[in-house]
C-alpha cells in the first residue's frame, strides 16, 4: 500500500467524521433549546414537543453516523488501494 494513499485516507476519514458532526451538533443544540423554550411556554404540550424533538434528533444524528460509515470505509475497505 502506498504511504501517500494511506495518509490521505486517514486524513479524509478524520475530516469526514469531524465535518459530519458539526452541522448536526449545532442543529441538535438549537432544536433542544427551542423545545425547552416551547415547553416553558406551553407545559401542556410537553408530550407532543418531546416526541417531535426525539424524532428530529434521531434524524440529525443519522447524518453523523453516515460520516462515520464513510470514515470506516476509507480506513478498512479503502477503494483507492
UniProtKB/Swiss-Prot annotation:
GO annotations of cellular component type: chloroplast thylakoid membrane; proton-transporting ATP synthase complex; proton-transporting two-sector ATPase complex, proton-transporting domain
Residues spanning the membrane: 3-23, 57-77
Q: Write the record's keywords in alphabetical order, separated by commas.
A: ATP synthesis, CF(0), Chloroplast, Hydrogen ion transport, Ion transport, Lipid-binding, Membrane, Plastid, Thylakoid, Transmembrane, Transmembrane helix, Transport
Function, in words: F(1)F(0) ATP synthase produces ATP from ADP in the presence of a proton or sodium gradient. F-type ATPases consist of two structural domains, F(1) containing the extramembraneous catalytic core and F(0) containing the membrane proton channel, linked together by a central stalk and a peripheral stalk. During catalysis, ATP synthesis in the catalytic domain of F(1) is coupled via a rotary mechanism of the central stalk subunits to proton translocation. Key component of the F(0) channel; it plays a direct role in translocation across the membrane. A homomeric c-ring of between 10-14 subunits forms the central stalk rotor element with the F(1) delta and epsilon subunits.
In its miscellaneous comment, the UniProt entry states:
In plastids the F-type ATPase is also known as CF(1)CF(0).
Instruction: Give the family this protein belongs to, as stated in its UniProt record.
Output: Belongs to the ATPase C chain family.
For this entry, the protein name equals ATP synthase subunit c, chloroplastic
Its gene is atpH
Amino acid at each position: 500500500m502506498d504511504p501517500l494513499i494511506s495518509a490521505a485516507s486517514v486524513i479524509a476519514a478524520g475530516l469526514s467524521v469531524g465535518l459530519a458532526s458539526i452541522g448536526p451538533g449545532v442543529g441538535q443544540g438549537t432544536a433542544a433549546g427551542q423545545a425547552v423554550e416551547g415547553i416553558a411556554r406551553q407545559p401542556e404540550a410537553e408530550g407532543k414537543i418531546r416526541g417531535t424533538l426525539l424524532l428530529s434528533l434521531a434524524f440529525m444524528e443519522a447524518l453523523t453516523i453516515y460520516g462515520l460509515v464513510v470514515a470506516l470505509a476509507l480506513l478498512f475497505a479503502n477503494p483507492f488501494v
